[in-house]
């Protein structure tokens, strides 16, 4: 059997152009949402202005925080909390309940079964197909699967990655991914997820996990993370931009899958016996 490679004309240029345009628009709307958030919080001065790389603290402050490492007390963190103090805020424990998943260990990994999602599979834009699986006989999917509107938040490795689950998922997540179930109605889910991925929370994660050889963000520290509560209309404006971004990204994926199927069908036709 002989195989001939598909010619270039099999690739629909209009489809490719449309795909690229949608990705660009998706990125634009997401960045617009980020810009709106930072504009509301920082105005025109959201980039830190301090040039000092040290601060002076009383020992009582160090004793209270339980941290003696100098990195924890950098002026940029003081500047962040000073800015947040100008807004109504809540800690994560006052916004969402936190549920831990499981960490079965590599010895439990299989080539088939229940998909096992790890931190490396998650970005703020979605979850890629896992290449590791767990036995359905050893783990309860019903208890551990991410449910619709749950926010996944990474606490180990690449800490502080947040993703809002769009629909119930047929998978189990790593213990390094916390499940946040929001109960505080003062926050829209898309707004909260954006804040978790923003510099506002990333700096708090950096502050808490500084000095560790392997980054680890303790759930007790995550509970105390400060979230600014912007007025609901502003949250809804930000959420609309996020939703538009994700809708465009989903449509671009559909187009890409369609293009792949077209090429695969043409390749099959070009097999010559």
Task: Please identify what each model-predicted range represents.
Residues 1-12, 171-178, 211-234:
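A short glycine-rich beta-alpha junction/loop motif
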Residues 3-102, 232-273:
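Non-catalytic DNA-recognition/assembly elements of restriction-modification systems
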Residues 49-52, 104-113, 207-209:
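Short coil/turn segments at secondary-structure boundaries
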Residues 116-118, 151-154:
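Short hydrophobic-aromatic micro-motifs
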Residues 144, 154-195:
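A short beta-sheet element
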Residues 189-202, 207:
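Glycine- and charge-enriched low-complexity intrinsically disordered segments
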């Amino acid at each position: 059997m002989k195989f001939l490679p598909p010619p270039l004309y099999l690739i629909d240029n209009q489809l490719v152009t449309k795909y690229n345009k949608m990705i660009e628009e998706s990125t634009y709307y997401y960045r617009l949402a980020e810009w709106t958030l930072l504009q509301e919080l920082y105005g025109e001065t959201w980039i830190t202005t301090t040039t000092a790389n040290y601060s002076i603290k009383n020992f009582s402050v160090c004793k209270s925080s339980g941290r003696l490492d100098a990195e924890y007390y950098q002026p940029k963190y003081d500047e962040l909390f000073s800015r947040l103090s100008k807004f109504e805020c809540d800690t994560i424990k006052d916004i969402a309940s936190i549920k831990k998943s499981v960490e079965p260990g590599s010895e439990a990994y299989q080539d088939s079964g229940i998909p096992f999602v790890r931190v490396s599979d998650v970005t703020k834009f979605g979850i890629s197909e896992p290449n590791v699986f767990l036995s359905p006989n050893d783990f309860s999917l019903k208890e551990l699967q991410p449910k619709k509107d749950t926010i996944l938040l990474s606490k180990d490795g690449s800490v502080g990655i947040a993703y809002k689950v769009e629909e119930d998922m047929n998978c189990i997540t790593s213990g390094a991914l916390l499940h946040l179930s929001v109960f505080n109605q003062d926050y829209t889910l898309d707004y909260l997820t954006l804040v978790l991925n923003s510099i506002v929370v990333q700096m708090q994660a950096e502050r808490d996990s500084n000095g560790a050889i392997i980054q680890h963000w303790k759930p007790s520290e995550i509970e105390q993370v400060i979230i600014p509560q912007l007025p609901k209309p502003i949250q809804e404006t930000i959420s609309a931009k996020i939703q538009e971004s994700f809708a465009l990204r989903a449509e671009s994926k559909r187009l890409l899958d369609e293009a792949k199927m077209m090429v695969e069908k043409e390749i099959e036709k070009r097999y010559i016996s």
